[in-house]
Swiss-Prot record:
Protein name: tRNA uridine(34) hydroxylase
Residue ranges occupied by any Rhodanese domain in the UniProt entry: 146-240
PROSITE patterns: RHODANESE_3 (PS50206)
GO biological process, one term: tRNA modification
Active-site residues from the entry: C200
Catalyzed reaction equations: uridine(34) in tRNA + AH2 + O2 = 5-hydroxyuridine(34) in tRNA + A + H2O
SMART domains on file: RHOD
An MF annotation (GO) of this entry: oxidoreductase activity, acting on paired donors, with incorporation or reduction of molecular oxygen
Organism per entry: Escherichia coli O139:H28 (strain E24377A / ETEC)
Assigned protein family: Belongs to the TrhO family.
Pfam entry (one): Rhodanese
Length: 350
């Protein structure tokens, strides 16, 4: 029976990937469709992806598939053909090709079965996830941005919004998509007559969010097809003004794609203009935060003097200190409660 999971250490895999000479392409895709047996589908796809030397992160559930992957450039078309042939529901699926990419985004293949491909917290049995808003293409997005009756809603986490967003887009301050959905409904209650345009990185979150808004009585709902990635690509190809400002945060080793030259965020330590996310180098912390080159040198890649001192300790002492310490996914939340207030929309948590 073939091995359907990785058995090599993370460090060894990363070193092997970095030593590769063949170029790679970073691709993301998703599809909401019914998967009767996610476990069997996962195992079959794992073998297919492994045979093509694909790395990345893939989630499967009864509701569909969500993937961010790195594919050897020479295998991209073979991968596309085999994916399309795998299931009729995947035929012709849009593959979002990364914009600012050296292909070194992943070094291991992780494929997991989950309850949902995006954790949404929705337990309403009457919710129809297929009743989504209308798609918008790049030119239509730009037209909507100039429409005074249109509101752009950013369905990404606060740390994604902080480094880049569409002009005048509203932030739904939250750490997770699950937290954002009810907030978006509450914040928009007084604006049901407006045109609601939702967007996210690659389309998966805003597609479901558009269905959720319609489920809650909003009738004028759109979402950007392919998210920020596809919008920026098409706008550039068509010679259109790119109206997204700053950097598009991505969930891989790159942590961001440069969309425009503007730097709209600031170092969380000194306040200098900066939009480069990093994880604290202290293995007992790993806080996600924005750090400029000067502070990176000053704090040796750590988020504080305390972490800097701890990371300099002998490995055994570091392990002793980490023992029993809760060290989950920590994020520096500078923007919670801070909103675009041009509409006087209150934060419902205040």
């Amino acid at each position: 029976m073939p091995v359907l999971h990785n058995r090599i250490s993370n460090d060894a895999l990363k070193a092997k990937m970095l030593a590769e000479s063949e170029p790679r392409t970073t691709i993301s895709f998703y599809k909401y469709f019914h998967i009767a047996d996610p476990k069997a589908t996962r195992d079959a796809l794992y073998q297919l992806f492994t045979a093509l030397n694909v790395f990345g992160r893939v989630y499967l559930a009864h509701e569909g598939i969500n993937a961010q992957i790195s594919v050897p450039a020479s295998n991209v078309e073979t991968f596309r053909a085999q994916l399309y042939a795998f299931d009729p529901a995947l035929e012709g699926l849009r593959l979002n090709i990364a914009l600012d990419d050296d292909g070194k985004s992943f070094w291991v293949l992780r494929m997991k079965v989950r309850d949902r491909i995006v954790a949404d917290g929705i337990d309403d049995p009457h919710f129809d996830a297929s009743n989504v808003g209308e798609y918008l293409q790049a030119a239509e997005v730009n037209a909507m941005l100039d429409d005074p009756d249109a509101l752009f809603i950013d369905m990404r986490n606060h740390y994604e919004y902080e480094v880049g967003h569409f002009e005048n887009a509203l932030e739904i301050p939250a750490d997770t998509f699950r937290e954002q959905l009810p907030k978006a409904v509450e914040m928009m209650q007084a604006h049901k007559d407006k045109k609601i345009v939702m967007y996210c990185t690659g389309g998966i979150r805003c597609e479901k969010a558009s269905a959720w808004m319609k489920h809650n009585g909003f009738n004028k709902v759109w979402h950007i097809e392919g998210g920020i990635i596809e919008y920026a690509r098409k706008a550039r190809e068509q010679g259109l003004p790119v109206r997204f400002i700053g950097k598009n945060f991505v969930f891989d080793e790159r942590m961001g794609e440069r969309i425009s030259d503007e730097i709209i965020a600031h170092c969380h330590q000194c306040g200098a203009p900066c939009d480069s996310h990093t994880n604290c180098k202290n293995d007992g912390c790993h806080l996600l935060f924005i750090q400029c080159p000067v502070c990176a040198e000053k704090y040796k890649g750590c988020c504080s003097e305390i972490c800097c001192e701890e990371s300099a300790l002998p490995p055994e002492e570091q392990r002793r200190r980490r023992a029993g310490r809760e060290n989950g996914n920590k994020i520096f939340n500078k923007s919670r409660g801070r909103l675009n207030t041009t509409l006087g929309i209150p934060d419902p948590t205040e």
